[in-house]
Swiss-Prot record:
It is an enzyme of class 4 (lyase). Its EC number is 4.1.2.50. The keyword Metal-binding applies. Belongs to the PTPS family. QueD subfamily. Zn(2+) binds at residues 18, 30, 32. Keywords: Lyase, Metal-binding, Zinc. This is Putative 6-carboxy-5,6,7,8-tetrahydropterin synthase.
């Protein structure tokens, strides 16, 4: 059975800035008002025969959104971006451009870029880990869509081990 959350209507949103390093137009700091759609597919389980209680999955997704909200999102695993942390300031460099920003205004994610595609993978992995930590073992897959606005987004499906 499938459970579905529409991020636009469920309030699963965050506003962040990012840079797609090397891209001709998106390679400058710019922002989006993102919303996150989530689908879970799995077996019904527990006393109430839920795939997952809506309150639980909404709380998980909202927590991740809140971690990214009003931050500059940067890719920790980009092979050509160099980072240095000094005195509560993050310095970073890509090609001939150098930046500095207070560390509390930035979040470094373990992804190679900050595209909607890589953010979808990040969200799916985070949701999977958090559900696993809560003891969920009945979910076959998680699908996450990261929407940069109405009508454009990227979707990723992560398959899980069911026990």
């Amino acid at each position: 059975m499938m459970l579905e959350l529409n991020g636009l209507h469920a309030g699963l949103r965050f506003s962040s800035a990012h840079i797609v390093f090397g891209h001709p137009t998106c390679g400058v700091i710019h922002g989006h008002s993102y919303y996150v759609d989530v689908k879970l597919y799995g077996e019904r389980a527990g006393d109430f025969k839920f795939v997952c209680d809506f309150k639980i999955i909404k709380k998980i997704v909202k927590e991740i959104c809140d971690e990214l909200d009003h931050k500059l999102i940067l890719p920790k695993n980009h092979e050509h971006v160099y980072y240095e942390l000094r005195d509560k300031t993050l310095y970073f460099k890509y090609e001939n451009k150098e930046y500095s920003i207070p560390v509390e205004d930035v979040i470094l994610l373990p992804i190679p870029s900050t595209t909607a595609e890589d953010l979808a993978i990040y969200f799916a992995n985070e949701i999977a880990d958090r559900l696993k930590n809560l003891g969920f073992s009945n979910i076959n897959w998680i699908e996450v869509s990261i929407n940069e606005g109405i009508g454009q987004g990227a979707c990723y499906r992560k398959y899980l081990e069911v026990k």
